[in-house]
Structure formats: structure tokens, C-alpha cells
């Protein structure tokens, strides 16, 4: 019996396998969230030197998602293999560096746990098949983008655009929706927030939404089609408004303080992709139009 046959015939094994892989991916996403913004900043600095015709900076050490090896940001202690086991290492080390005893951010085990649970749920929801595998990839990408946007107010094109093209390619085979719906989902997703951006700017003279949000909604439209866009925009706006007010209260910040919108779009789009049809059907039934 092949591995594919075993996983397709044993749903629990597929869910557990997806959860374990999700834990490992979550550990890697911690690296992506930490390093990718720094890598982009380096790239932008080099581009700025070229555009402004400034003297070239001395080349620094190699810095990417692989090198240098992970180390403690406080003392520089190189993280060994046994110290990098998802969740377990954090518990074994009691949340502190083995060298300097500095506290390790709780974001690392929480990201690993969230990714593992998310992966297991996707596997359970879809069952073994291409849909589950591709939604896993999408979920990992959305999690990374959400964490980066929450911390840096940045949605990197290097994450958003490949996923948008992947959605279009997958739907050229009709994996989730037709290519026609996916294409217009991408176009409408971008144009919807682009229109809101310029209307808000004309009225207030301020930027209300980032360009990364346009691309993120376009990417979600490429996966789920134009049909999921109204629900995605509505859910993200409601959740963003509620949580935004709560965060502003907790931080004692002003209403002009910028808040990232990407995480709310990501959550709403993920929900709409998985349950959009059921939620819409329930709504029409609730209002008596079905």
C-alpha cells in the first residue's frame, strides 16, 4: 500500500500527519516573519543607493532564510537542533535561552501551535486530496503575511503575488472555482479596495488602506472567485472595526494610529473560502429569501 493510499483510507492519519507537518512549517514561518522584512529592507536600501547614485555600501554577510543559522537575539548563542523542536523545545527550556537565560518570545511556540492546529483542521475539513494540500499552502502563507503585517504593517509582494498566481493556475483546472470566476475575482478584489483607497483619500486627504491590501484581496479572489469578495470585505471590516477599537483602548492610542488590515482580510478570506457558500445560504434563509 502506497503512502497516498494509506492517507486517503485513514483520515485520522492524514489529520495527524498534516498537524505534525504544520508544526514544522510553523517553526519555519517564525524564521520568515523575523528575517523577510530585514531582507527586504536590505534590498530597498541597495535600490535606493542605485537610484540616488550614492556610493555603494560594503557587502554584508550572507543573510537569507537559510543563513546565518538561527541564534539568540540577546547573546548570539547558536540555536542547536534539539533547541528548535516545535513547542517541545520551548517547554523543555522553560521559555528561556539555554545560554543567557533571556526570555524567548511566546510568539514562537504560539505560531507553531497555531500552524499545527490550522493544518490539522484543514486536513479534517477537506479530507485527503489536492484541495486540502493547496489550502494548506494558502493557510501557511496567510499566517506568515498576517504576522508580518501585524508587526511591520507590510504585506510582501514576494509572498502575496506567487500565491495569487498559484490560485489562478489551480483554478485553470477548476480546483475551487472556474478560471473565469478566479480571474474576475482577482480583478474585482484589487479594484474594490483601490476604489475605497482613492475615495477615502479624496475626502480626507489621507491614505486609509495600503497597496498590499489591494493585492491580498486580489489573491483571495484568485483562489475563491469573485463570489467570496463581498463576504470577505464585510467580515474583515466588522472584525477590524471591533478589534481595532479594543486595541486602541488597550494601548490608549489615538484614532489616527494606523492599524494593519491584512490579518483581518486573511482571516475573513480563509473563512469565506471554506464556508462561504454555507454562510451565504444561511443568511438568505435567515432573512426569508430562500
What does each model-identified segment do?
Residues 90-131:
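Short microdomains enriched in Cys/His and/or Lys/Arg
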